């Protein structure tokens, strides 16, 4: 089992998308790389925590390789958007990939370079070692499963399509 942390705007959609993929073992949403211990949603939204809304994704590398995760992630967010995704604006909505295993860094950066070359654009996606992660409040967990009409900037049904690099 491997783990990666993905930030691409509101964490509801990122979780909704990746939870539909074969190879996802479990996930939870929360706040990554916060300057404050165990921040609340309200404090994160104030912009004073330094945290980013993120998905903690545990996955089976044989069924869902990291390259596919990063490729899919980049296909459902706007990697060129600085501090916003869709209608969500603020530093807590910046996009990034946060790794635990050092060996993941080169794979993530390679995938980003391939995306930039293919799209002729410069991504602003952060690629950093995870400093910390705090679980979000219970009402945020699996939000789109519990609230089918909840706002989301990501079409989570795209996860059902066959992946092609």
Swiss-Prot record:
SUPFAM superfamilies (alphabetical): Peptide methionine sulfoxide reductase
Biological process according to GO: cellular response to oxidative stress; protein modification process
Highest rank taxon of the organism: Bacteria
A molecular function GO annotation: peptide-methionine (S)-S-oxide reductase activity
Catalytic residues (positions): 10
EC supergroup of this enzyme: oxidoreductase
Reactions listed under catalytic activity: L-methionyl-[protein] + [thioredoxin]-disulfide + H2O = L-methionyl-(S)-S-oxide-[protein] + [thioredoxin]-dithiol; [thioredoxin]-disulfide + L-methionine + H2O = L-methionine (S)-S-oxide + [thioredoxin]-dithiol
Family matches, as HAMAP family: MsrA
Family note: Belongs to the MsrA Met sulfoxide reductase family.
Listed name of the protein: Peptide methionine sulfoxide reductase MsrA
Name of the gene encoding the protein in the UniProt record: msrA
């Amino acid at each position: 089992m491997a783990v990666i942390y993905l930030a691409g705007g509101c964490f509801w959609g990122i979780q909704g998308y990746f939870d539909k993929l074969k190879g996802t073992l479990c996930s939870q949403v929360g706040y990554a790389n916060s300057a404050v211990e165990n921040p609340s949603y309200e404090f994160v939204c104030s912009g004073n925590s330094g945290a980013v809304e993120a998905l903690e994704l545990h996955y089976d590398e044989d069924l869902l390789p990291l390259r596919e995760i990063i490729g899919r992630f980049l296909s459902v967010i706007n990697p060129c958007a600085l501090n916003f995704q869709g209608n969500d604006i603020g530093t807590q909505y910046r996009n990034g990939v946060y790794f635990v295993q050092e060996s993941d860094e080169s794979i993530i950066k390679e995938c980003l370079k391939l995306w930039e070359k293919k799209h002729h654009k410069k991504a602003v996606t952060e690629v950093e070692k995870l400093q910390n992660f705090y679980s979000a409040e219970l009402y945020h967990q699996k939000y789109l499963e519990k609230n089918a009409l909840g706002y989301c900037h990501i079409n989570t049904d795209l996860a059902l399509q066959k992946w092609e690099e």
